[in-house]
Amino acid sequence: FFDFIESYIFGKNRTIIDKSNINDNQYVDWASGSFLMILVEVYERIGGFDEHYFMYCEDLDLCRRIHSVTGEKVFYINEVKALHFAAHNNRRLFSKHFLWHLQSIIRYCLISKY
């Protein structure tokens, strides 16, 4: 949560990973919701995306529930690429996107006991 606040106040985000340095397939904590592949059985077992999230943190929550409910892990495959044209409208302090993002982070922290 404090990394999120710091990224807005001071403009730096220590949680971003330089993906150009990742050359191996590996297990990760979570993956972006803009490009996920999930077995239908796993998706249905966890109840899909939590519709109480709006635009932000739904992918973190989904990956956390996959692991906690099924024991499955999220796996990053280096050879698979996708291009996501993200607008990043959540970067302006106190914009509606910022507030949605903040709301989702608070929800995620409370639900996951982060």
Predicted regions and their residues:
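A structural signal for well-ordered alpha-helical scaffolds and beta->alpha junctions
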Residues: F1-D3, A31, F98-L102
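Generic structural signal for conserved hydrophobic packing positions in ordered secondary structure
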Residues: F1-I5, L39, I105
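Short, flexible, basic/aromatic active-site loop/helix in glycosyltransferases
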Residues: F1-V28
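Hydrophobic transmembrane alpha-helix bundles
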Residues: I5, I9, R14, H52, ...
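A short, conserved alpha-helix in the catalytic core of glycosyltransferases
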Residues: N21-N23, D29-G47, H52-V80
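Residues at structural and domain junctions
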Residues: V28-D29, R91
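Active-site-adjacent helix/loop segment of glycosyltransferases
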Residues: D61-Y114
